[in-house]
């Protein structure tokens, strides 16, 4: 083989001269120097037959001509945009992968192999003399932009393999209607947009492997099994929209060995065409709507080795499952199982997953095989009871140490032997109150189930409830112990690095990984993620200090993505190993990112996961599960149905409640104002069954259909505008509820970035103004109105004895003071006020009058408004204000005081008072507050700047 390459040391002595034109109409051809001609002549050749230009930095338009004897050409990993090979009539093998090709012209006279994956091609042109490459045997055009296959593909009679995955194909009519292929063995159309398949021609009977996963197919052709049953061994139709399989009554000698139907809408009717698939070894039926596994089918699958039934509605497994002597992997998580067969008879069973079912009691002696079982998962069965004596007997029979893994995050070291309802209730409470929840899944390769090659670090409470540390370490071949030791050593190392004050904030992550590799040895890949709270003040909203930050350090091929509401962000860099890094520790990639309400999930996976699944598919699957553990398990099951054969490891962190204290207050306000939807019973259609329990899966459950009443009209902050502006249909109100909440939270975050908001329709603008007032001026408005009340008491000539007696009442806590404790205390406590009630029924005119009625419903906590009694707080300038002792008290009226009347009907006070009397008192003391008019005008202009509305004083 004559390999012509370009030396970087001296470009003038290179054997190959290439001229590439980006803009010229006639690109210059590739030429060979005289030295190369002499070398070719010594071998008895007039021109080289094999030419490799891999990684030669070729760009632009390339025209290669005058090479009549060139048979093999490799131009991979360049930056070519146009490649014209129309003059190479003797070319047999062409490899042009990983370029930027948008146009490719080939000569199909003798072409046998065409590999053009990872480009931007949407068509491949041929010459007029040979429009169809009749000798073509293999074509790979995956990872391109094809919307349909080239029109000459179906006429290539010698084709044996077609790979057109990861394109934009919406149909393959060109291939099926003009089908002249006689020996096609493999067809890969996965990861496209196929919505329909026409009837298969008779020539399709030769196919053995058909990949159709991750498409939009609602059904397979009616003659599918009639044509393919004799030779088809591998069929993958996972993640489509199949509801049934085509029937074929004469399918007595089906050749199917590997069948993947995960992630569809299949029901119990699919087992009829699979009844006689006696050669079946691998069956993936996860995440469908299967309720019963027929015992007759199980008896006809004696060679079954892998059976995956996760995410269905199975209530029991047939006893015939215990007769599958070759079964190695059985996954039935996320079902409705109440009992299990005696699986201890399965001597070859190595992986058993029965998690997230309804199991209450398990007989380990009848369930667990004594010797070969490597992984047993019984987590998620909330009422599960295990006999501790049975556990000890099984452990002694296996003569091995059993490692217990608690997936709940409580780090329990023992099996649950009794029902613990309190722990379950506390666990559910933690799920709703924490800033994030974590789920993980890991499994060995399907070929070798002996050990894991990827180890995880899961420290959910690393430094407290709002701090976590996660990591993933992939071992080198035969060095799994180094990765395992690193996962145990990293937490202590990072605490030591955090104590170093001289280094940068995020450098402790980098040095932690380097120190771990120095002590434990090198690993193939490593990734470390630290979630913690930052208290850096915001520039626009000073109170918005409760922020969370994600810090990451990674090396190798582990990939991590941050899934947001409308996009996905890759956190790790592509794995590029340089020559100087082969025998040295690579420099970790460090990243620091402030989390926001738009961030939904953090997904970390090893290279095997991302080799069969992209982030778009992963995000789509994760959003189908509310439980983070089930989301991680779903990714692993889907990846295995996509033919992932090696070890898989996934960590899924679901973010929620990442907002600030003010955001939490606003969220609680919205929940108290809006009427909560009440569940209603709807008539169930035939076959509609609750797919999962309500705690695990709520998105597809028909029993959770709810209806919400329309909001009571509040079209303006003052509540005095027309209510018809907010009138909506009940169904529309519930359907758009989630989108409306997301939009409101996004508007809260926009206040950190800008000080201007675009104009909108009247009702939306008024709602924004009301929301802004609640967020920015809640504290200010409480102080202002309570000060007004206190001043009115101090100006009265006669004070009832009952009220004066209230001054000696004890304080409720250190941060709250009684309203009438002292006359000089002009600024009242900001906690929820509790005014004393007068004993006498006669109340003087102008004094405080309290109406006895049931207090309105509370929202949130009084701690949301508490501050020290010595200081007030101004939300506009973020500065504490000192307490005045005597003299004229400065009025604490904000720019939104005009809307305080409307707020009174929403704020859940513990007292009520007459608004007319309050307004009369306010007019009587205006002479003391004239010097605050300038401040009020300034704030009023600011309100106009933000929202374009005018304010009026009450």
Curated annotation (Swiss-Prot):
Residues 437-655 form the PPM-type phosphatase domain. Transmembrane segments: none annotated. This is Protein phosphatase PHLPP-like protein. Protein phosphatase that specifically mediates dephosphorylation of 'Ser-586' of Akt1, a protein that regulates the balance between cell survival and apoptosis through a cascade that primarily alters the function of transcription factors that regulate pro- and antiapoptotic genes. Dephosphorylation of 'Ser-586' of Akt1 triggers apoptosis and suppression of tumor growth. InterPro entries: Leu-rich_rpt (IPR001611), Leu-rich_rpt_typical-subtyp (IPR003591), LRR_dom_sf (IPR032675), PPM-type-like_dom_sf (IPR036457), PPM-type_phosphatase-like_dom (IPR001932). Residues 1-28 are annotated as: Disordered. It comes from Drosophila melanogaster. Gene3D superfamilies: PPM-type phosphatase domain (3.60.40.10), Ribonuclease Inhibitor (3.80.10.10). LRR repeats lie at residues 69-89, 90-104, 110-131, 135-156, 158-179, 183-202, 206-227, 231-252, 255-275, 279-300, 303-324, 326-347, 348-369, 372-393. Keywords: Apoptosis, Hydrolase, Leucine-rich repeat, Manganese, Metal-binding, Protein phosphatase, Repeat. It catalyses: O-phospho-L-seryl-[protein] + H2O = L-seryl-[protein] + phosphate; O-phospho-L-threonyl-[protein] + H2O = L-threonyl-[protein] + phosphate. One of its GO terms (biological process) is apoptotic process. SUPFAM superfamilies: L domain-like (SSF52058), PP2C-like (SSF81606). SMART domains: LRR_BAC, LRR_TYP. One of its GO terms (molecular function) is metal ion binding. Its cofactor is Mn(2+). The lineage of its organism: Eukaryota, Metazoa, Ecdysozoa, Arthropoda, Hexapoda.
């Amino acid at each position: 083989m004559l390999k012509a390459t370009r030396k970087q040391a001296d470009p003038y002595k290179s054997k190959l001269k290439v001229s590439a034109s980006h803009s010229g109409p006639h690109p210059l051809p590739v030429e060979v120097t005289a030295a190369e001609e002499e070398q070719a002549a010594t071998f008895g050749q007039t021109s080289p037959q094999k030419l490799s230009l891999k990684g030669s930095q070729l760009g632009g338009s390339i025209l290669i001509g005058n090479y009549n004897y060139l048979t093999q050409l490799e131009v991979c990993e360049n930056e070519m945009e146009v490649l014209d090979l129309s003059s190479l009539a003797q070319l047999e093998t062409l490899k042009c992968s990983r370029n930027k090709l948008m146009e490719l012209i080939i000569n199909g006279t003798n072409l046998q192999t065409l590999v053009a994956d990872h480009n931007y091609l949407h068509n491949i042109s041929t010459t007029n003399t040979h429009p169809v490459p009749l000798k073509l045997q293999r074509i790979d055009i995956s990872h391109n932009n094809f919307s349909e296959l080239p029109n000459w593909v179906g006429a290539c009679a010698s084709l044996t393999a077609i790979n057109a995955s990861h394109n934009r194909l919406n149909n393959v009519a060109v291939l099926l209607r003009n089908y002249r292929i006689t020996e096609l063995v493999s067809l890969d159309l996965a990861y496209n947009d196929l919505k329909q398949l026409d009837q298969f021609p008779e020539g399709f009977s030769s196919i053995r492997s058909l990949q159709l996963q991750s498409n939009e197919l609602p059904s397979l052709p009616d003659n599918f099994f009639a044509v393919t049953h004799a030779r088809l061994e591998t069929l993958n139709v996972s993640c489509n929209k199949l509801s049934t399989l085509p029937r074929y009554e004469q399918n007595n000698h089906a050749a199917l060995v590997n069948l993947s139907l995960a992630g569809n809408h299949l029901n119990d009717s699919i087992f009829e065409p699979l009844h006689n698939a006696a050669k079946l070894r691998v069956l993936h039926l996860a995440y469908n709507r299967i309720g019963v596994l027929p015992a007759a089918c199980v008896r006809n699958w004696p060679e079954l080795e892998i059976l995956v039934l996760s995410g269905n509605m199975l209530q029991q497994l047939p006893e015939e499952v215990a007769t599958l002597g070759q079964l190695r992997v059985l996954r039935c998580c996320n079902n409705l199982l109440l009992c299990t067969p005696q699986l201890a008879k399965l001597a070859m069973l190595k992986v058993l997953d029965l998690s997230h079912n309804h199991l209450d009691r398990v007989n380990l002696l009848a369930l667990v095989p004594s010797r070969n079982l490597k992984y047993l998962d019984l987590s998620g069965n909330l009422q599960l009871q295990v006999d501790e004596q049975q556990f000890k007997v099984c452990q002694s029979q296996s003569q091995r140490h059993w490692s217990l893994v608690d997936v709940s995050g409580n780090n329990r070291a023992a099996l649950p032997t009794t029902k613990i309802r309190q722990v379950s209730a506390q666990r559910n409470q933690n799920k709703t109150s924490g800033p994030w929840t974590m789920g993980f899944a890991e499994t060995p390769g399907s070929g070798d189930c002996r050990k894991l090659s990827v180890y995880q670090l899961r420290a959910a409470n690393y430094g407290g409830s709002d701090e976590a540390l996660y990591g993933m370490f992939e071992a080198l071949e035969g060095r799994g112990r180094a990765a395992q030791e690193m996962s145990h050593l990293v937490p202590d190392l990072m605490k030591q690095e955090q104590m170093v004050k001289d280094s940068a904030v995020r450098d402790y992550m980098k040095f932690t990984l380097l120190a771990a590799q120095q002590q434990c040895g090198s690993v193939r890949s490593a990734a470390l993620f630290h979630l913690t709270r930052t208290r850096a003040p915001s520039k626009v909203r000073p109170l918005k200090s409760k922020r969370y930050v994600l810090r990451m350090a990674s090396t190798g091929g582990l990939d991590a993505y941050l899934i947001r509401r409308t996009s996905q962000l890759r956190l790790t860099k592509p794995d590029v190993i340089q020559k100087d890094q082969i025998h040295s520790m690579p420099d970790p990639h460090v990243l620091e990112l402030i989390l926001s309400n738009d961030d939904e999930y953090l997904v970390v996976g090893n290279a095997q996961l991302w080799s069969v699944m992209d982030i778009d598919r992963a995000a789509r699957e994760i959003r189908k599960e509310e439980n983070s553990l089930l989301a991680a398990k779903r990714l692993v099951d889907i990846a295995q149905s996509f033919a992932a054969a090696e070890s898989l490891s996934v960590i899924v962190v679901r973010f929620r409640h990442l907002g600030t204290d003010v955001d939490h207050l606003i969220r609680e306000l919205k929940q108290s104002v809006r009427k909560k939807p009440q569940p209603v019973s709807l008539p169930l259609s035939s076959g509609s069954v609750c797919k999962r329990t309500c705690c695990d899966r709520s998105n597809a459950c028909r029993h959770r259909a709810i209806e919400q009443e329309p909001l009571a009209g509040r079209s303006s902050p003052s509540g005095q505008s027309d209510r018809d502006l907010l009138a909506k249909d009940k169904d529309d109100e519930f359907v758009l509820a989630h989108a409306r909440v997301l939009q409101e939270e996004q508007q809260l975050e926009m206040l950190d970035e800008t000080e201007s908001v675009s104009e909108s329709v009247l009702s939306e603008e008024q709602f924004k103004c009301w929301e802004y007032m609640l967020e920015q001026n809640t504290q200010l408005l409480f102080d202002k109105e309570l000060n007004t009340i206190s001043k009115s008491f101090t100006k009265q000539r006669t004070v009832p004895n009952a009220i004066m007696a209230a001054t000696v009442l004890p304080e409720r806590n250190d941060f709250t003071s009684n309203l009438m404790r002292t006359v000089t205390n002009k600024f009242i406590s900001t906690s929820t006020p509790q005014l004393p009630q007068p004993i006498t029924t006669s109340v003087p005119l102008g004094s405080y009058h309290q109406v006895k009625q049931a207090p309105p419903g509370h929202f949130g906590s009084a701690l949301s408004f508490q501050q020290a009694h010595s200081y007030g707080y101004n939300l506009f300038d973020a500065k504490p204000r000192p307490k005045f002792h005597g003299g004229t008290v400065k009025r604490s009226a904000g720019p939104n005081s005009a809307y305080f009347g409307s707020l009174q009907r929403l704020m859940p006070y513990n007292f009520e008072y007459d608004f007319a009397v309050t307004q009369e008192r306010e007019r009587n003391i205006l002479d003391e507050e004239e010097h605050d008019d300038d401040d009020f005008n300034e704030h009023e202009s600011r309100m106009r700047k933000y929202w374009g509305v005018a304010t009026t004083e009450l």
